[in-house]
Structures are given as C-alpha cells and as structure tokens.
C-alpha cells in the first residue's frame, strides 16, 4: 500500500512539472466589443432604428500560445468579428471580418499579463438579408494595433480587457474601427 501511495505521488508530481513546462497550448476565446464609427443605420417600418458599428460586437477566436520564457508568451489567433442589426422581419445588415492577431505578453505577476501586438483584418464587409438583401460593401484589408491586460482566474481561464486601434477604408472613405472589449479565454 505504501509503495502504491508513493508511486501515485511521484506520478502526480511529475505530471504537475510537465504541465508547467508546456511550451505550446491552445486558446479559444469570446469577446464583447464596442466602439468605432457608425457604418450604417437601419430604420425599420415601426420607426425604430439600429446601428452597425465598426468596432462591435462579438469576436470569437482560436489559436495557440507559445511560451518563450518564464515571463514571456506569444499568441497567434484567427477569429471572426461581427456586428449585426436585429433584423426581425424587415431584414438585417451585418458587418463581419476575419482578424488574425499576433500578440506578445509579459507576465507581470503569476496571474496577470500585459501585452499587445498586431491585428490583420481580412475580408471586412457589410452584407444584408431579408428585404435589405442586395446591399453589400467591401472594405480593404487593414492592420491595427492591440493593447490588453489579462487576469488568469485559473491556469486555464483568463479574463481580459483590451483596446484595438484600426481603420477601415474603401473607395476613398475611411471609418474608425477603434474599440474596447471584455474577453473570456480558455487555454487548453
């Protein structure tokens, strides 16, 4: 019985060390964002309105985090960022884009990291459906900057606040996509 207990403790200790030394792990996340210029306003038949913002609203992403040292990590993610009008029966507009982010983080404390990097936004467009179908507007690909802080609630769960500075351009017109956001990250 003693040998089994000792063997179990040794294996548990080795597993803990191995978990701490992992140099690559996956990350999945979800964020709520707000800000940026109003790209479009929809007026419904009942008189209500709804706006599409260049910095809104939901951002989902997945990727990998690479540990470069005890205090530094790099993160590479691909995501989908979207803002959409409510639509109901009148139709709706959607502003969607596909950001690729390359970020570096410095771990200022065991449970907190600060960082930032570049955000490459691809295929940004406004499209429509319902009675609004046919409306479509495409933006040029763009590069922005990200600054963020993340509190690690546990080794696998992070909560972050971030700010993104970016600008969308098309046909000589530009719109600010600057926005802030609150994110949930799951490290696997």
Language-model features, listed with the residues they occupy:
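Short glycine/proline- and aromatic-enriched beta-strand/turn motifs that initiate or cap beta-hairpins
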Residues: 19-77, 104, 112, 121, ...
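Surface-exposed loop and membrane-interface regions of Gram-negative outer-membrane beta-barrel proteins
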Residues: 47-52, 74-97
């Amino acid at each position: 019985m003693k040998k089994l207990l000792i063997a179990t403790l040794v294996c548990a200790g080795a597993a803990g060390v191995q978990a701490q030394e992992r140099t690559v792990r996956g990350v999945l996340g979800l964020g709520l964002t707000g800000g940026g210029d109003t790209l479009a306003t929809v007026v419904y038949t009942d008189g209500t309105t709804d706006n599409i913002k260049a910095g809104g609203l939901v951002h989902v992403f997945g990727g990998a985090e690479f540990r470069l040292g005890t205090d530094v990590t790099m993160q590479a993610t691909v995501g989908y960022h979207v803002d959409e009008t409510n639509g109901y029966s009148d139709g709706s507009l959607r502003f969607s884009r596909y950001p690729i982010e390359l970020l570096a983080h410095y771990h200022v404390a065991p449970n907190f990291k600060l960082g930032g990097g570049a955000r490459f936004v691809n295929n940004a467009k406004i499209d429509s459906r319902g009675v609004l179908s046919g409306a479509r507007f495409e933006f040029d690909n763009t590069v922005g900057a990200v600054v963020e802080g993340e509190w690690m609630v546990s080794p696998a769960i992070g909560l972050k606040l971030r700010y993104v500075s970016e600008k969308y351009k098309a046909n000589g017109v530009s719109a600010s996509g600057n926005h802030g956001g609150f994110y949930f990250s799951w490290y696997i």
